[in-house]
Amino acid sequence: MAEMNPAQGHVVFEDVAIYFSQEEWGHLDEAQRLLYRDVMLENLALLSSLGCCHGAEDEEAPLEPGVSVGVSQVMAPKPCLSTQNTQPCETCSSLLKDILRLAEHDGTHPEQGLYTCPAHLHQHQKEQIREKLSRGDGGRPTFVKNHRVHMAGKTFLCSECGKAFSHKHKLSDHQKIHTGERTYKCSKCGILFMERSTLNRHQRTHTGERPYECNECGKAFLCKSHLVRHQTIHSGERPYECSECGKLFMWSSTLITHQRVHTGKRPYGCSECGKFFKCNSNLFRHYRIHTGKRSYGCSECGKFFMERSTLSRHQRVHTGERPYECNECGKFFSLKSVLIQHQRVHTGERPYECSECGKAFLTKSHLICHQTVHTAAKQCSECGKFFRYNSTLLRHQKVHTG
């Protein structure tokens, strides 16, 4: 082994030590702390045998968790550096009082290859630390990364499915999938959620916060996944094809929902009335019928609505906004559904046909009104007069009620 170059200087404990923050230390169990202590003691012993640190001065100093300022404050449990257990020499079987004296004794064996070059010693120390901390004996996990000690092992196991988690709170959130527990309640509408992060995203529907903005069109979204899905609109990509009808979709979730049109599957059931829905969002909207919650209030007239989209449409009454334009005649409409109905004037389309007489209509409401012609006439209970339409009967009855 080459002699040490004086220009390179001594290797000190700080060069090869690994330190914890207070938070990291708190994540280690007793076995992991003892393992860390053993490795640091070996590092110190090797340096002591080279005369690179003063073991006698620090020998009895306790190893405290905290910010390291030297050899005596390695981040480890409180036992003293000097251990009372005898240490056997692997070369000659001699018993030494402690690990420091064993290191000094090892130097008496010329065949022992001591590192006098700081670079060689530093590399040896890193390899030794990796080997110690990554070995599988005793179930000790690997927790060295970037010359610091971290818990990379996932030590919290779900007893139901065996999935492992690195933090206890993540395991707790996961276990709610098995129990169905929903502990996070929205203070505005009362809906319950399994995870706090899901509740936080939901609450943005009440506050109006939309932190994720598309850099193409400026449209903002409640959560990042919605932004990612939206951005495929600009690329035009539709990679998901329905095997039944060949229709293409931008997102796999939309394809899955669409395929329920063919299968008739409605997996989302209301616990209140037993009604089933094709997608979860429809169930959430329906559930508000039972809760009676109307969380979205109009700042102009004070009227409340169950959904933000309904509030947005209502507010056009006050603003006069008509964002939907007919490309045939240039007429504007406040609702897209009204524009679609209007466009049938230009196309001649009449999609709603009477099953009795075959007459077709522009809108479903017109068809329903027409179908009363084929049903029994409506009779006034007061005077016995008959009417074709229920609406006409109701107007007539006001004559009797005043």
UniProtKB/Swiss-Prot annotation:
<feature type="zinc finger region" description="C2H2-type 4">
    <location>
        <begin position="212"/>
        <end position="234"/>
    </location>
</feature>
<dbReference type="InterPro" id="IPR013087">
    <property type="entry name" value="Znf_C2H2_type"/>
</dbReference>
<feature type="zinc finger region" description="C2H2-type 8">
    <location>
        <begin position="324"/>
        <end position="346"/>
    </location>
</feature>
<dbReference type="InterPro" id="IPR036236">
    <property type="entry name" value="Znf_C2H2_sf"/>
</dbReference>
<protein>
    <recommendedName>
        <fullName>Zinc finger protein 547</fullName>
    </recommendedName>
</protein>
<dbReference type="Pfam" id="PF00096">
    <property type="entry name" value="zf-C2H2"/>
</dbReference>
<keyword id="KW-0677">Repeat</keyword>
<dbReference type="Pfam" id="PF01352">
    <property type="entry name" value="KRAB"/>
</dbReference>
<feature type="zinc finger region" description="C2H2-type 6">
    <location>
        <begin position="268"/>
        <end position="290"/>
    </location>
</feature>
<dbReference type="GO" id="GO:0006357">
    <property type="term" value="P:regulation of transcription by RNA polymerase II"/>
</dbReference>
<dbReference type="GO" id="GO:0000978">
    <property type="term" value="F:RNA polymerase II cis-regulatory region sequence-specific DNA binding"/>
</dbReference>
<keyword id="KW-0804">Transcription</keyword>
<keyword id="KW-0479">Metal-binding</keyword>
<comment type="similarity">
    <text>Belongs to the krueppel C2H2-type zinc-finger protein family.</text>
</comment>
<feature type="zinc finger region" description="C2H2-type 9">
    <location>
        <begin position="352"/>
        <end position="374"/>
    </location>
</feature>
<keyword id="KW-0238">DNA-binding</keyword>
<dbReference type="Pfam" id="PF13465">
    <property type="entry name" value="zf-H2C2_2"/>
</dbReference>
<feature type="zinc finger region" description="C2H2-type 7">
    <location>
        <begin position="296"/>
        <end position="318"/>
    </location>
</feature>
<feature type="zinc finger region" description="C2H2-type 5">
    <location>
        <begin position="240"/>
        <end position="262"/>
    </location>
</feature>
<keyword id="KW-0863">Zinc-finger</keyword>
<feature type="zinc finger region" description="C2H2-type 3">
    <location>
        <begin position="184"/>
        <end position="206"/>
    </location>
</feature>
<dbReference type="GO" id="GO:0005634">
    <property type="term" value="C:nucleus"/>
</dbReference>
<dbReference type="GO" id="GO:0008270">
    <property type="term" value="F:zinc ion binding"/>
</dbReference>
<comment type="function">
    <text>May be involved in transcriptional regulation.</text>
</comment>
<keyword id="KW-0862">Zinc</keyword>
<feature type="zinc finger region" description="C2H2-type 10">
    <location>
        <begin position="378"/>
        <end position="400"/>
    </location>
</feature>
<dbReference type="GO" id="GO:0000981">
    <property type="term" value="F:DNA-binding transcription factor activity, RNA polymerase II-specific"/>
</dbReference>
<dbReference type="InterPro" id="IPR001909">
    <property type="entry name" value="KRAB"/>
</dbReference>
<dbReference type="InterPro" id="IPR036051">
    <property type="entry name" value="KRAB_dom_sf"/>
</dbReference>
<keyword id="KW-0805">Transcription regulation</keyword>
<feature type="domain" description="KRAB">
    <location>
        <begin position="11"/>
        <end position="82"/>
    </location>
</feature>
<feature type="zinc finger region" description="C2H2-type 2">
    <location>
        <begin position="156"/>
        <end position="178"/>
    </location>
</feature>
<keyword id="KW-0539">Nucleus</keyword>
<feature type="zinc finger region" description="C2H2-type 1">
    <location>
        <begin position="87"/>
        <end position="109"/>
    </location>
</feature>
